Amino acid sequence: MTSAGVAPTALRLLTALLLLLVAAPSHSLPLLTRGRWIVDEATGLRVKLACVNWVGHLEPGLPEGLNRLPVATVAHTISSLGFNCVRLTYSIHMLTRTSYTNATVAQTFARLNLTEAASGIEHNNPELLDLGHVAAYHHVVAALSEAGVMVILDNHVSKPKWCCAVDDGNGFFGDRYFNPNTWVEGLGLMATYFNNTPNVVAMSLRNELRGNRSTPISWSRHMQWGAATVHKANPKVLVILSGLQFDTDLSFLPVLPVTLPFKEKIVYEGHWYSFGVPWRTGLPNDVCKNETGRFKSNVGFVTSSANATAAPLFMSEFGIDQRYVNDNDNRYLNCILAYLAEEDLDWALWTMGGSYYYRSDKQPVKDFEETYGFFNHDWSRIRNPDFISRLKEIQQPIQDPYLAPGPYYQIIYHPASGLCVESGIGNTVHLGSCQSVRSRWNYDASVKGPIGLMGSSSCISTQGNGLPAIMTENCSAPNNTLWSTVSSAQLQLGTRVLGKDGKEKWMCLDGSKSPLISTNECICITDSHCYPKLNPEKQWFKVITTNKQLLHQLQL
């Protein structure tokens, strides 16, 4: 029954939202692309992929950790932490070599002398030991389906082993272990095996193409061949294409575009890690600006509305040592979180598992710890709950162009906490939920002006160095309430304040006393202000324009 107080447009939006909420837990409908977005084929509404990688491409031929926990427990943990998707890795040899196709999980673990791991599987997942490897994968995918988790099947390697080295024989078409015909055969088999599996929503063709054989022309020929093979075997799934240079380069696409007829199923992917970049020793704002610019130029451009062939970009790998002991990782993380939030990309964290059954490239080869994993070494707890909490806001769509076309407003995202600037009780300003009505602001970051709370006459003001930021209604004051982005990375919000010495200084919003937001003298906005050990990242805030207001009003 229609309420007399509900406008027809709002009612249609509410109906669409309810359809989305009903569909979301099962993720059972095929997906397709519309411009730069991934959408539900049935409703046309956006679906954001917030995934975690689950490694299964190594020598044992089984997704990791099933010696530690029942598969249902792993699946429900993934879901409970806010991930709606798993990028599940596999090897081509698992599908094409008799050493795997004619073997059970138990036989492969025996061949690798993984007696202790096999004993753990017998305790936690006894039904897996007598299954073949592909059947075991089916079992894992089914458990993820029961937990409402979508799956992306990712061909990581041909020969099962750790990835990636330039010369490991798995890098590019024609390498020692990378026979293109066998690769296409394996893709077709995997697509066929999972053809009637609703929660398998995408297949990624190959991880981190690399090496001396790499050329854009060879990439174009082989990747389109693989994509066509997958689409023919399973036309429902999205087909994800990785780039060159360890999945950091798609810059050749404007001159060598993909010409497949099923454009609505094509997604591109990119990787971004801290490796080889002076995050710890360089000027933080400059390093973040330069690395963000590099990624946008080489990969991120595919989503641009200025690009006639705009398509979704899936950040299929990013991650850090989750112990927070690596300064390079820690500084990179704040930069990439700001980028992921601003661009509202689909993404997959590397990684889930806290250890591996067997890694031939490491010592010890058995039970090697993975400090990038969100589980700890023995999978008994979450390694770093604070890190996981920082992902919560970017697990949600920030833009929803097909449900809520407007009005637009701004959120002010703080990557060091994963929270947003929120107006509190009284005149306080603190870090809180990005979904809150009181975290919606009117602010044009391109000009100097007030940061006004949407629907009110109040704006943010500074009281001085080291003091809490406050809300005020005196929003036309020449200082204290007029804010600008003041660093090369465009991540610090500062206002000019007259000091006791009669000189003006820049005061920046600062989240170092989280959840309270204070204002402190801006750090590192110029080279001369950034001496060793100064780190401005608690002052990093990203202003993001969003249109989620209608969505959240309807949910209320």
UniProtKB/Swiss-Prot annotation:
**A single BP term in Gene Ontology:** polysaccharide catabolic process
**Sugar attachment sites:** N102, N113, N212, N290, N307, N474, N479
Keyword annotations for this protein?
Answer: Allergen, Carbohydrate metabolism, Glycoprotein, Glycosidase, Hydrolase, Signal
Q: Which one Pfam family would you cite for this protein?
A: Cellulase
In its record, the post-translational modification comment is:
Glycosylated.
A GO molecular function held by the record: hydrolase activity, hydrolyzing O-glycosyl compounds
Give the family per the record. Answer: Belongs to the glycosyl hydrolase 5 (cellulase A) family.
Q: Which PANTHER family match?
A: CELLULASE FAMILY PROTEIN (AFU_ORTHOLOGUE AFUA_5G14560)
According to its UniProt entry, the function of this protein is described as: May have glycosyl hydrolase activity.
* Protein name from the UniProt record: Glycosyl hydrolase 5 family protein
UniProt organism field: Chamaecyparis obtusa (Hinoki false-cypress)
